[in-house]
Amino acid sequence: MLDFVILHTNDLHGKLSQQAAEIIAREKNSCDTCILLDAGDAIPSGNIYWRPWGEPILCRMADIGYDAMVMGNREFHFLAAGLESKVKLARFPVLSANIRCTKRSICSCIVPTVTFCIAGLSVAVLGLTVPMITKQMLAAKISPFWFEDPISAAKDIVPSLRDNADIIIALTHIGLRTDMELAAAVSGIDIVVGGHSHSLLSEPVWVDDTAIVQAGYWGHYLGKTELTISSAGKRTVHTSLIDLRD
């Protein structure tokens, strides 16, 4: 029997108290078979302004031990310099599989997927971001970036991930309703760790065989999703919320 744990936050908006950071780090360090993920909008900046020196909360998250995050709408910027500045202090992968750019080199700071080996399991994490610019928008004429529909992007990528991964996690910043549409449209995703809608889910939302989880907003809670795989291959999911408030 194998136990695999996903610790997750979303929509921090720059709010990560010292107490919250200590609890998250303690939970991460107490488990040898876990990953710590963030489902986007960790930073406080909006879509126009950016700090040239970077976002300090990403340094704190790296110090805590975050393994990856998905780019939320707050991490995105329509200029290449802005996007790079926003995420440059993250010492962990920042994901989005549905961002597109005129030259790959200008969004090399964003990767579509990352794979971890945990307790002998291959765990693939796929990032999906709410589309901020589409090709039909006027903004696409001045920005080097545009976004593909996240569900279409997942349909293209998940089958190839399934060939090599034991577990597939969609780390999304698209909102609960679209998470449910994603799970219904794309088979092979085990767990959706979501953000954007600020949904506080005390239990997973199930769509077919896919569990959807989300942990509210502003660092009030840490989500804990425990996946148990029996020797016969049967999988069970248990979720809980850890209160991080002062």
Descriptions of predicted regions:
Residues 1-246:
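Acidic, metal/ion-coordinating pockets
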